[in-house]
Every structure is written in structure tokens, then in C-alpha cells.
């Protein structure tokens, strides 16, 4: 039978960094609240959560990378909101942030979770920050817990 690896959803003993974009703060603050709530409800101690605010979503990957350079975190959550406007700016920002977040995770070997809302309208973004479509910050935190535990299991099995 094949050996199966899965991460569990127990946050006790894990440390998290969270990078939050200040642009659209009325939305990103809800993402941060959802993420912190999920982490704490899953057993992460409040003093094991550190938050860094950045001006906008484009700056998220750099600060996530700098946080991981400190070797203090089991995962970093990246939270922001990019809303489509009348120019191609949305495509550039959304694409580069997603690539940057993925690159940081691949380069460091530490889970870096993409919790950035990309939406066509502000209404869609608000819904995904906790009204009708759940809270993407909460979802990012749960993914972070699972991935941090999975990486630990993979490392301990070698």
C-alpha cells in the first residue's frame, strides 16, 4: 500500500507570518480578521502570529520573502485585494502577485499561501471577504495550517 502524507488542521506549536496589503483596507482588514480568527480557533497562540502591512498587493511577495528570511515561521499568509478597473493594470498586478507569492514558496520551501482576492467588482471582493462567499483570509489560514503540518510530516519522514 502506498504511503500517504496529509497535513492536519492542528495549529498548536506553529508560527505564522501574515502580509496584508493596505490598499482596499476596508476589505483586507476583514481578511486579516478572518485569518487570525481561524489560526487561533485551530490552536495557534496569538503571540505566534506576526503581521506586516504593505502599501498594496504588488509589495506582498517581497515582504513575504523578507519575513521568511528570519526563519521564524512555519508558513506565511499573503492577503490583499485586486479589483478590476478600466485599464489592464488589474491583469499585471494580479498576475505578478500570484507569480511572486508562488516563487517565494518554491524558493524557500516554506508554505506561502495566496489569500489575495481578485475580483471584477468591489461587491464581489466584499462578498469574498466574509459576507456571502466565505472569508478568503480564513481559507488562507486553514490552508496554511494544513500545508505547514504537511511539510513537517514530509521533513520528518526522510
Curated annotation (Swiss-Prot):
Active-site annotation: 89 (proton donor)
Catalytic reactions of this protein: (2S)-2-hydroxy-3-oxobutyl phosphate + 5-amino-6-(D-ribitylamino)uracil = 6,7-dimethyl-8-(1-D-ribityl)lumazine + phosphate + 2 H2O + H(+)
Keywords: Riboflavin biosynthesis, Transferase
EC number: 2.5.1.78
One matching Pfam family: DMRL_synthase
One MF term in the entry's GO annotations: 6,7-dimethyl-8-ribityllumazine synthase activity
Residues that, per the record, bind 5-amino-6-(D-ribitylamino)uracil: 23, 57-59, 81-83, 114
Summary of the function given for this chain in its UniProt record: Catalyzes the formation of 6,7-dimethyl-8-ribityllumazine by condensation of 5-amino-6-(D-ribitylamino)uracil with 3,4-dihydroxy-2-butanone 4-phosphate. This is the penultimate step in the biosynthesis of riboflavin.
Family indicated by similarity: Belongs to the DMRL synthase family.
Protein's name according to its UniProt entry: 6,7-dimethyl-8-ribityllumazine synthase
Native source species: Desulforudis audaxviator (strain MP104C)
Record lineage: Bacteria, Bacillati, Bacillota, Clostridia, Thermoanaerobacterales
Name of the gene this protein is made from: ribH
Amino acid at each position: 500500500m502506498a504511503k500517504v502524507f496529509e497535513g492536519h488542521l492542528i495549529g498548536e506549536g506553529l508560527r505564522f507570518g501574515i502580509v496584508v496589503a493596505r490598499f482596499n483596507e476596508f476589505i483586507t482588514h476583514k481578511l486579516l480578521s478572518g485569518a487570525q480568527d481561524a489560526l487561533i480557533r485551530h490552536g495557534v497562540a496569538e503571540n505566534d502570529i506576526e503581521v506586516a502591512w504593505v502599501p498594496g498587493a504588488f509589495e506582498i511577495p517581497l515582504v513575504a520573502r523578507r519575513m521568511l528570511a528570519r526563519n521564524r515561521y512555519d508558513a506565511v499568509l499573503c492577503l490583499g485585494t485586486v479589483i478590476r478597473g478600466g485599464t489592464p493594470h488589474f491583469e499585471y498586478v494580479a498576475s505578478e502577485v500570484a507569480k511572486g507569492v508562488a516563487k517565494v514558496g518554491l524558493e524557500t520551501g516554506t508554505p506561502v499561501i495566496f489569500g489575495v482576492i481578485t475580483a471584477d467588482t468591489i461587491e464581489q471582493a466584499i462578498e469574498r471577504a466574509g459576507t456571502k462567499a466565505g472569508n478568503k483570509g480564513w481559507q488562507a489560514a486553514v490552508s496554511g495550517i494544513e500545508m505547514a503540518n504537511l511539510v513537517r510530516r514530509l521533513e520528518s519522514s526522510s
